[in-house]
Amino acid sequence: MKKILLISDTHGYIDSMILKYAKKADLVIHAGDIGDVKVLDELSKVSNLRAVYGNIDSTEIRSCTNENEFLNVEGFKIFVTHIAGKQPYYNNRVRNSIKKEYPDILVYGHSHILKIDNDKKHNVLCINPGAAGRPVSYTHLTLPTKRIV
């Protein structure tokens, strides 16, 4: 089983509770609006980190992250982006990526609202972990060792 910590919208602040959970995770996914490269440094010290940049992120952060990430974790394809739009309509960039890549899980941020929803039209589990800055919200995701197709 893979334990994944999903966070977004830290805006330059990383709570000690988030770092505690990050240490226990096999992977940390940050869905953008990192706010300060120090957040990436702190998370990278304690766990395997994958992150995308958000709309507030500096050139420095954008130089070491991408707008989108596609991860394969235990046979699950995970699409990570910052701004996705409202399911099942999405913005054009995300909708085109979903149609091309067929992810199982979409992790996104931006709204600061923790939300987990199943997009039945595109067969995608959509997860917005909320804002891990102030106040703190986050999501844990545990994937089985191997996906059975």
Residue ranges and their predicted role:
Residues G12-S16, G35-V39, I56-R62, G85-Y90, ...:
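Active-site environment of divalent metal-dependent phosphoester hydrolases
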Residues Y102-D104:
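Proline-aspartate-enriched helix->loop->beta-strand connector
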Residues L106, C126-N128:
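Conserved beta-strand scaffold positions in the cores of enzyme catalytic domains, especially
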Residues R93, S97-K100:
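Non-DNA-binding regulatory cores of transcription-related proteins
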